[in-house]
Structure formats: C-alpha cells, structure tokens
UniProtKB/Swiss-Prot annotation:
Protein's UniProt name: Prolactin-4A1
UniProt GO molecular function: hormone activity; prolactin receptor binding
Signal peptide start and end residues: 1-31
Alphabetical keyword list: Disulfide bond, Glycoprotein, Hormone, Secreted, Signal
PROSITE patterns: SOMATOTROPIN_1, SOMATOTROPIN_2
An annotated GO BP: positive regulation of receptor signaling pathway via JAK-STAT
The keyword DNA-binding belongs to this UniProt entry's keyword annotation: no
Record's keyword annotation contains Transmembrane: no
Cellular-component GO terms for this entry: extracellular space
Intracellular or extracellular location(s): Secreted
Primary location group: secreted
Glycosylation (residues): 41, 175
Transmembrane spans: none
Length: 227
C-alpha cells in the first residue's frame, strides 16, 4: 500500500510539473511574440484582432444580404452570370485561398487588406444613394447599404490600429485602378444599370471575403504561431 501511494504521489508530481512547464512556456512564448511585435499588452493586441475580424464578418453579412437582394429582384433570368468582367481591384495581386496567402509576408498581407478596403471607399459612398435613386430600394435595404459603408470605414480604422500597435508599415497610397462604374449605375438603360449593381456586388463579395480570410490567417500566425 505504501508503494502504491508513493507511486500515485509521484505521478501527480510529474503531471503538475508538466502543466506548470507548459503554462510557463506559453507565457514566455506570448511575451516573446509581444516583444517581437513591439506591443506591451499581448492580450489587448489579440482583442484588437478579434474586433477587426468581427467587423469584417458583419460586413460580409451585409454584402451577402444585399447581393442576394440584387440577384433575386434585378438579375434573375438576365444571364448576368455568363458575362465576363474585370473588377477595379484586379490590379492588386490578391491571393485567393489560404495556401496562396500563406506565401505572403505578414506586413504585405495586412497592407493588401488595407488596400482592398480603401479601393471600395468611393464605390460604397455612392452605392446606398444609387440603390435609393436607381433601384427604389426600401429603408431596410438602404440601411444595410449604409451600414456596409460604415463597416468598411471602421475596418480600415481597425487595420490602421493593428498596424500601429504591431509596428507594421502600411502603404496608404496603393496602386489600383480607380473605380469608374458610377455612370453605369446611373444608366437610363435598365439592363446596363442592373448589371452594374450585380457586378459591383460580385467584385465586392470576392474582395471582402478575401479580407476576412487574410485577417484570420494573420491573427493565427501572429497570436497562435501555428495555423
């Protein structure tokens, strides 16, 4: 009996030591990453990422709702999905999946997220007004369009905050083709006008989904180390 109890106590001691060492290693790793990122409060920095990702997710929900609305009421049966178009952000070299994004440096990927959002400032500024004037959208739909515009601005600010806290440099004058589709949104030709709205949401959805993917991947690489 004495040997059995001694053996149990020995096992518990080893287990406690392992847990203690694991916690110590995690704290040390967090401190090292915090020092590397030049941030004083690593937990707060993680919260900043969480807030940015939440804004991105909300933004994508607004886009999904509005895109579905346009498809059902203005694009259905018109064959818009068979047309080939080029998005105004196509000049930005954007990875389209996690495997491609993994090949980009952290600072580059964060800067790309900023550039994509910045490229949509002008289109989203006009979108909600044109949905009212050209589509006769109802207040609930217009509210989502307005919230979409505001979410884009908030997410840009969140990314700037992340860059500032993490000592990243972001190029705020990214080289992308200026958006020039306003005339098509305002076209007196119904088919041209409807396709312009359809294509805007097609491009916006792709870019915004990519931004959310980039932010999640960046947080994973910076905060958790393994992805």
């Amino acid at each position: 009996m004495h040997l059995s109890l001694s053996h149990q106590w020995s096992s518990w001691t080893v287990l406690l030591l392992l847990v203690s060492n694991l916690l110590l290693w995690e704290n040390t790793a967090s401190a090292m990453r915090a020092k590397l990122l030049n941030v004083h409060n690593y937990t707060s920095y993680g919260d900043t990422w969480n807030q940015a990702i939440k804004i991105s997710q909300d933004m994508n929900q607004y886009i999904s709702d509005l895109s579905t609305h346009v498809k059902i009421f203005y694009a259905q049966g018109r064959g818009f999905e068979r047309r080939t178009t080029r998005c105004h952000t196509s000049s930005l070299s954007s990875p389209e999946n996690k495997e491609q994004a993994q090949q980009f440096q952290l600072e580059v990927l964060l800067g790309l997220s900023h550039s994509l959002l910045q490229a949509w400032l002008n289109p989203l500024h006009h979108l909600w007004a044109e949905m009212c004037d050209r589509l006769g959208s109802t207040p609930p739909t217009l509210y989502k369009a307005l919230m979409l515009k505001e979410s884009n601005i908030k997410l840009l600010d969140a990314i700037k905050n992340i860059a500032k806290k993490g000592n990243f440099e972001i190029n705020e004058k990214a080289n992308y083709t200026a958006w020039s589709e306003l005339g098509f949104l305002q076209s007196p030709n119904r088919d041209t006008r409807y396709f312009a709205f359809y294509n805007l949401f097609h491009c916006l959805k792709k870019d915004s989904n990519n931004v959310e993917m980039y932010l999640k991947l960046l947080k994973c690489r910076l905060i958790r180390s393994k992805c």
